[in-house]
């Protein structure tokens, strides 16, 4: 037995030493990327949003994504969930980020940048957001008017449609917009998982509007099924009505305006 063990020991060759090079692993981001926003006119300007890992701007020179919200403290980590991003079609330097991870947490904030995302002014808003809730991969809930960069619309999950007339510095609810809240069985558990997604995307129709007031015709879609979920305004957002003949058996997720 001992002899066998001695032979086995003699058959094992020493392992050659290997030189390893150690370096830090670059962790440049986190969260699930649920939306990418491109500027319609300026090539290379794009942003992406994540459910709970902040927002990022594409850096064409270095071919990488630059984090924009790493300055947010742990105490305010609810703002790391990004609900929507909007870029001003007339001025690519103006970008707006709607922040709030859960509707069960504190109210969200709109971060306004007028220098391409290098600095931000924080505007606290009186409604919650749900960047990490159901429907996070829907279209953009916040959109800048392509004919008047002062005007921004923001569709919320639980609190209707809101509008800013001063580049995001203040917000007021559009009280004429219909109630699109989703009704659930009161016996269901009260958790974010069974709360509605609310308004999910906004589209402007710029055809025929050249008076400087902004875009006259605006479409807003809500994540509803079995009832009207697509609405239009033909008077600059003052009044709203359901679009006729719309299918109600599906939930809308994104919208694109066609030529007809």
What is each of the regions a protein language model found here?
Residues 1-4:
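Bacterial N-terminal signal peptides
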Residues 7-260:
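Extracellular glycan-interacting surfaces
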